[in-house]
From Swiss-Prot:
It comes from Mus musculus (Mouse). The keyword Protein transport does not apply. The gene is Cxcl13. Keywords: Chemotaxis, Cytokine, Disulfide bond, Inflammatory response, Secreted, Signal. Belongs to the intercrine alpha (chemokine CxC) family. It is found in: Secreted. It comes from the Eukaryota. This is C-X-C motif chemokine 13. Disulfide bonds join C32-C59, C34-C75. One of its GO terms (cellular component) is extracellular region.
Length: 109
């Protein structure tokens, strides 16, 4: 009888212990899209789409995924200087090309 009680308590304790940190410590988290990244420059003429995914949803790192026009997926190092310049350029283009909302003039009463 004692053996089954001890086994039951051990099973209960293992169910209540946090396991989230253990998986991240051993890098066994499979929710990241990129298993490896490159830092070499990707030609602008072959880029179809860029996606930047911040840490979260089970992946502890920022990921930058580039889809080429040939439907190839490339994971790029988010700290690569050429990529940082490209993202700043794209962001400034999108901000400058956004039309401004119309402003209605009100008369003072």
């Amino acid at each position: 009888m004692r053996l089954s009680t001890a086994t039951l308590l051990l099973l209960l304790a293992s169910c209540l212990s946090p396991g989230h940190g253990i998986l991240e410590a051993h890098y066994t988290n499979l929710k990241c899209r990129c298993s490896g990244v490159i830092s070499t420059v990707v030609g602008l003429n072959i880029i179809d789409r860029i996606q930047v995914t911040p840490p979260g949803n089970g992946c502890p790192k920022t990921e930058v995924v580039i889809w080429t026009k040939m439907k190839k997926v490339i994971c790029v190092n988010p700290r690569a200087k050429w990529l940082q310049r490209l993202l700043r350029h794209v962001q400034s283009k999108s901000l400058s090309s956004t039309p401004q909302a119309p402003v209605s003039k009100r008369r003072a009463a």
